[in-house]
Amino acid sequence: LNKEYREKFSLLNYYTYYKDKWRIGMEEKKIVVAGHVSLDITPKFNMRTKVSSIGSVIKAGKLVNVGQVAIAPGGCVTNTGLALKKFGVDVKLIAKVGNDEFAEILYEKYRKQGVEPNFIVSEEDNTSYTIVLALNGCDRAFLHDSAANDSFCEKDIDYEVVRNSDYFHFGYPTLMKEFFREDKDELRKMFKKVKNFGLITSLDVTTIDPDSEQADIDWNQRLSEVLPYVDFFVPSVEELCFMLDKNKYYEIQNRASDDVCMHLSLSEDIVPMAEKVITLGCKGVLIKCGAAGMYLMTSDSVRMKELDGKISIEEWSNKRIFQNSYTPDRILSGTGAGDTSIAAFIYGICKGMTPEDTLRIAAGTGASCITEYDTLSGLLPISILKNKIQNGWKEQNFIHK
């Protein structure tokens, strides 16, 4: 009798587990991507060889011959949102622009991707733009005007659209004045409202200029206020290190003569930061480590239980996974690689994939993105990406354990 009971109980667990996985994966999820948008202007550098740093090319008094310029939508809303659209996901975009020519270019570019933008239009602000300096062999640099992003605030969010969705992703509050000002509480208020609707939430940030007012903010304190309402925090290792420990950030910068991500220790640099973030309240942290790959850490099943019915708690609890990057077919530009990899990460969550498979398609998406100058042209359909991985796509082992 005991054996028969155990067998029935085991079959019941098996049925329940796979029934839930089927339901999570087959339901069509509605995703909202909100936050920062800009027009990216990227000149093509005709370099014969790889360079170690941008400073070795761009110097005072020197003329640098460049090629055709690429003009494309940029920012989190574009890069993550349109990548999700390309993956076949139902996605709504929330952002703020000016009433100007740059906005018209953005609208035209979005429509070509099959998206009708319904952005908030400011008559007082211009549309944000970014000049992207992307040279083969070194990390990118940016010249950026936040513009209308600085007046975007929590009240600009269309909460009716959010309420009728399943997943909410917000990007780049570190570049949006109303969201990073210390006398404001916009970021926490927004995520608390969204979380009360029962959505899965994620937060992305971007590089902080050490000479900006954002650099003086106590980001440990700010994150401790916001992350309890964030399920997945998805920063890069440089961004996170600057926020948590500036001294450590400068120490790593000094240690690395070129790409910081190539000089990281998993045990000494990445894992301690991930552990710190988990204590600040989020359920999981995905740290993007550039050419090295990405690291996922999730909390225990007690905290993850809040996402029951939305993801597999058994599969996603207590995870510690470093996913190596994949060898790209070629390297033209790193623009949007992190954002599009996050789009694949969100896709995997919403489709009921395991964390291991989710990280594989996220890393594969990043490696595909950098094969073109713009963000979207190099992206592969998820089915083709999976086949490429299953057929032995070579991983790159750059991380120091």
Feature locations, PLM:
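Short, Lys/Arg-enriched N-terminal segments with co-localized hydrophobic residues
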Residues: L1-G25
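Conserved phosphate-binding/catalytic region of the ribokinase-like
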Residues: R23-G35, K192-N196, E225, L244-K401
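A glycine-rich helix N-cap at a beta->alpha junction
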Residues: K109-D125
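Structural recognition of alpha->loop->beta junctions
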Residues: Q113-E116, D216-F242, E315
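Conserved phosphate-binding/catalytic loop of the ribokinase/pfkB sugar-kinase fold
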Residues: S122, V132-E178
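Glycine/threonine-rich flexible loop motifs
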Residues: L175-D185, E213, L244, I252
